[in-house]
């Protein structure tokens, strides 16, 4: 019994210390980016020896993988579970929440989607999250089909990619400030409206068959 209590206390201390380390790493990353974060610098901020921090994280990459997981949990928590009365608003809600995430958690959005230096920190958790979100979005598309707002043969995968691009691009513009004159909040609304118009008009239908490969006439072949 005593051994179990000691083990639980040690585990609790270990987890708390890991969270504190991640908080320090997150702060350093927010201020000056991926290159500014080193295991030695984080250890110094924590009052550790340079070697002691490796007990909690074996590498900088592992530390950022844990930070990326935190960002994913925040993003998933922001993904809607509710259903709105209007099917179009209901469809767009996950994409609007994704765009809002870029503004409420810009450092995590940058880490997850924009920072090439931190790209190695991403992996299966990110893929699994996207898969869960995709299943939810497909259900929202099917509701629009059932209610006669979109044609039955709409290509849901392509349509979903269009909506994602409509929010991701303005999110990046908002975070980078480039181009400086652009107004991402206005752009995202215009792009979403344009995508919905394309869906309603039947411009994003499933192909009847795979495009045939073009071949040159026999006389034109070398």
Model-derived features: positions:
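Short hydrophobic clusters on alpha-helical segments that form packing/core surfaces
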Residues: 21-29, 71, 75, 98, ...
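N-terminal intrinsically disordered/low-complexity leader segments
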Residues: 1-16, 176, 206-222
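Hydrophobic alpha-helical bundle segments that form small-molecule/ligand-binding pockets
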Residues: 119, 132-159, 174-180, 202-208, ...
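Amphipathic alpha-helical segments used for helix-helix packing
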Residues: 103-121, 172-178
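Hydrophobic alpha-helical connector segments
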Residues: 80-108, 156-163, 208-218
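Alpha-helical DNA-contacting segments of helix-turn-helix folds
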Residues: 63-71, 112
């Amino acid at each position: 019994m005593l051994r179990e209590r000691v083990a639980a206390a040690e585990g609790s201390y270990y987890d708390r210390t890991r969270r504190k380390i991640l908080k320090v790493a997150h702060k350093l990353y927010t201020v000056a980016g991926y290159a500014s974060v080193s295991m030695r610098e984080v250890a110094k901020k924590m009052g550790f020896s340079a070697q002691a921090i490796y007990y909690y994280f074996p590498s900088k990459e592992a530390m950022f993988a844990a930070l990326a997981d935190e960002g994913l949990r925040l993003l998933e928590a922001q993904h809607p579970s509710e259903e709105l009365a209007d099917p179009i608003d209901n469809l767009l809600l996950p994409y609007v929440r994704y765009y809002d995430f870029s503004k409420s958690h810009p450092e995590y959005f940058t880490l997850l989607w924009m920072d090439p230096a931190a790209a190695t920190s991403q992996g299966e958790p990110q893929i699994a999250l996207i898969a869960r979100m995709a299943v939810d979005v497909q259900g929202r598309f099917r509701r629009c089909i059932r209610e006669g707002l979109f044609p039955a043969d709409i290509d849901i995968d392509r349509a979903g990619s269009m909506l994602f691009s409509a929010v991701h691009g303005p999110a990046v513009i908002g975070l980078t400030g480039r181009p400086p004159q652009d107004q991402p909040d206005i752009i995202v609304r215009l792009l979403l409206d344009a995508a919905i118009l394309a869906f309603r008009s039947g411009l994003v239908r499933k192909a009847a068959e795979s495009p045939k490969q073009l071949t040159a006439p026999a006389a034109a072949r070398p």
